[in-house]
Amino acid sequence: QSAHDTFWDFVGLHTEATHHTFWNMSDRGIPQSLRTMEGFGIHTFRMINDAGETTLVKFHFKPRLGVHSQVWEEAQITGGVDPDFHRRDLADAIEAGAYPQWDLGVQVFPDTKEEMFEGIDLLDPTKLVPEELAPVEIIGTLTLNKNPGNYFEETEQVAFHPGHLVPGIDVTNDPLLQARLFSYLDTQISRLGGPNFSQLPINRPHSPVNDNLRDGMYQQAAHTGIAPYKPNSLDAGNPTETPIDKGAFIDVPRPVEGHVTRRSPASFEDHFSQARMFYLSLTETEKQHLIEAFSFELGKCYEEAIKLRYLDVLAHVDQELAETVADNLGLPHPEQQEVPDASPSPALSQLGKTWPIDGRRVAILIDSDQELD
């Protein structure tokens, strides 16, 4: 729930959130189903081949059913009458054999010293790379073909973490990703009762683990070694790390130069161009839905100063948009602002595409007063 002063005070003062807020207020914020949601990480990762060559990538999951949303009135009714709709819809589809599927794809970028692509900082999590500039290359398919047998054990206890990576995928210096590498681990230790959450069946790797972790809450292994450190001469040097020729992952060395500061680079200071790109990419219907969402949410705020501040944010993206929302709120138009240059990305619109009917419920409406032949 974001229709309150706290949220709009925050995003109005943290304008780097503008692009994200436009996505939230758009039709994508009220998906028709979990089966019709796109999945993509906001971070850039580094892929490494056997020769030690690196490439930067962004991961995408494209739903086979396409990307679809509810309309506002439908979302209000569904949320009030059937708030568990999304989870039940997903479970029902799996149970019926209409297995939800997503195509896994990657956007691939050269791993340059600047870590930029077409003027876009690949380490800035508030920005995306338009698919027209870097097409998504499909490399696999994700299929959900089984419901949990025990929801608590198999879902509630899952410990997701961006640092859980397979050999060949490494992190970048995206500052938000680096923060998440710490915070996710810290959260799982708190949420799942201690440092041994990785021993829970749903989190346990297929291969046995032999490491130096000992004791702690909910420890399930009976360790008998007396030297949980390395190197040691008491346990024959065990445990030892897996060598490279046995599949161990090794970080690729990278040169570093410059000054270490607590400031973001200048490329991070562009807070509005991608929000404008997103807005220009929408159809007129989608734009109208976005305007109505901004008007509804800001209309629930009590502090007029917060509303006026965010109208100024909108003016940095599109003056007509800002003035329309201001009219809906009964507030004066914000001052004209300089808006950034931006071109639409057709891939960001949900409309204008055709998709299969598989796994959908179909309703047939019949008017008894009309001749059907």
Q: Where are each of the predicted segments found?
A:
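Active-site-adjacent core segments of small-molecule enzymes
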Residues: 1-372
